[in-house]
Amino acid sequence: ATLLSKREIEILVHLAMGKNNAAIANDLNLSVHTISNHRKNMLSSSRCSTTAELVRIATIENLI
């Protein structure tokens, strides 16, 4: 079972494409603050130190 919500995985896919919070917020019609919160929550729940590490682990686990 994944620790990430569907929305978090959706955001993670955008992060893996190299998009920043503002671009993701624009694409998903959300606020930059919301994207930032999701990103922080993903890092916290996954115990990853960086977004790059989070993307790497998600790729290995076939989440994205």
Model-derived features: where do they sit?
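Recognition helix of helix-turn-helix DNA-binding domains
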Residues: 20-53
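Regulatory hinge/linker segments at domain boundaries
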Residues: 1-14
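Short alpha-helical segment immediately N-terminal to, or the first helix within
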Residues: 12-17, 28, 57
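Enrichment for repetitive, rod-forming helical segments
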Residues: 14, 46-47, 63
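Intrinsically disordered, low-complexity basic tails/linkers immediately adjacent to helix-turn-helix/homeobox/MYB/SANT
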Residues: 57-64
